[in-house]
């Protein structure tokens, strides 16, 4: 499976989850570069604080993290200019299947909601839906 994405970002405070997702994405060869962040604030600053860096194609963000949560990350992302948002597909990747969480995420246009674990099938469906 190849999608020719330049950059995928994983934002998750769980090191094991990030490691496994990084391995899966590497094995699938879907991106030239994969970056991982354990803190949402650091990820946001690195990705959108420096306007000289190209925006990532895809960002996976967990909802439940210490410090800035995935919901706060989505708020910051949603406040970016539409032209900036249009360059990146945002996907929540979480263990939560609570209806309150899915409803909160649903208020953000164009944000995908996936439950953990990330699998080859889920990745394939996301790529087909958003990048083909």
Please provide the spans of the model-predicted regions.
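Conserved acidic segment of CheY-like receiver
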Residues: 6-16, 21-25
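Conserved sequence signature across two-component system core domains
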Residues: 11-12, 37, 59
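Helix N-cap/capping motif at the beta->alpha junctions
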Residues: 36-49, 70
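Short amphipathic alpha-helix used as the core "switch/output" element in two-component signaling
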Residues: 45, 71-84
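Active-site beta3 strand of CheY-like receiver
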Residues: 52-60
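Receiver (REC) domain active-site loop signature in two-component systems and cognate sites
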Residues: 65
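Alpha4 helix (beta4-alpha4-beta5 surface) of REC/receiver domains from two-component response regulators
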Residues: 72, 85-87, 91, 96-114
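C-terminal output helix
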Residues: 118-127
């Amino acid at each position: 499976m190849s999608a020719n994405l330049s950059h995928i970002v994983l934002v998750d405070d769980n090191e094991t989850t990030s490691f496994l997702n990084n391995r899966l994405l590497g094995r699938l060869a879907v991106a030239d570069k994969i970056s991982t962040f354990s803190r949402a604030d650091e990820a946001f600053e690195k990705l959108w604080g420096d306007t000289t860096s190209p925006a990532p194609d895809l960002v996976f963000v967990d909802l439940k993290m210490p410090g800035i949560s995935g919901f706060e990350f989505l708020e910051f992302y949603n406040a970016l200019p539409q032209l900036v948002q249009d360059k990146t597909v945002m996907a929540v990747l979480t263990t939560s299947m609570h209806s309150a969480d899915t409803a909160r995420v649903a208020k953000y246009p164009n944000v995908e909601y996936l439950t953990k674990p990330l699998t080859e099938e889920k990745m394939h469906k996301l790529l087909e839906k958003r990048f083909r």
